[in-house]
Amino acid sequence: MIKAVIFDMDGTLVDTERLGIKAWKAGAAELGLAIDEALIHQFIGRTLPDVMDILDKHYGSHETTEAIYRRHKEIRDEMVKTELELKAGAAECLDELLAAGYHVGLATSSRLVTAERNLKMVGLFDKFETVTCGEDVVHGKPDPEMYLLACERAGFAPEECAVVEDSRNGCVSGITAGCHVFAVPDLSLI
């Protein structure tokens, strides 16, 4: 029986992935570089160290990776202030689950400071009983560590937890952890 529902954040609850794609492209362009959208899609659901490794391999230079990341972050942080949107039905879903007595948790590859900022902006942060972030794990999604820790923090076995995810990496993470996984893909990214 499912007793807890653990949500991914980016692309599942808030539309940050669309902003991230725009910011990666703009940051690279400002530095005179190109970044392919297929490469950016590899970042979805991954921790920052994993993203940096992907970029290091792609560009062959950690200095280039650092420069693109810094500019992307500046652009994204500005965009979030005015363009961040809640995914349709997210707030209502959380409210219904809480009212029905389910434990509601968050498992995001984002850092806690980012998750807290973004979710407070859309009025969702206080709805989560437990929060697991990218800096809490050594191995990011698709490794199961994120969801295993989220289940542990929730106080339930993985088979008692449902995971709500939008990315392939996140779904693989939840499935490998032994959770029930519900995929809600962001159709604008397909």
Range-by-range predicted roles:
Residues 1-41, 176:
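Active-site neighborhood of HAD-like aspartate-dependent phosphohydrolases
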Residues 1-3, 95-98, 111-190:
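Asp-based, Mg2+/Mn2+-dependent phosphohydrolase catalytic module
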Residues 13, 86, 104, 139, ...:
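Conserved SAM-binding loop
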Residues 19, 43-47, 85-89, 110, ...:
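Short beta->alpha linker loops
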Residues 27-28, 47-61, 118, 150-151:
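Helix-loop "lid/cap" segments that line or gate small-molecule binding pockets
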Residues 30-33, 60-63, 123-127, 155-156:
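Short helix-capping segments at alpha-helix termini
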Residues 34, 55-92, 100-102:
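Metal-dependent phosphoesterase signature
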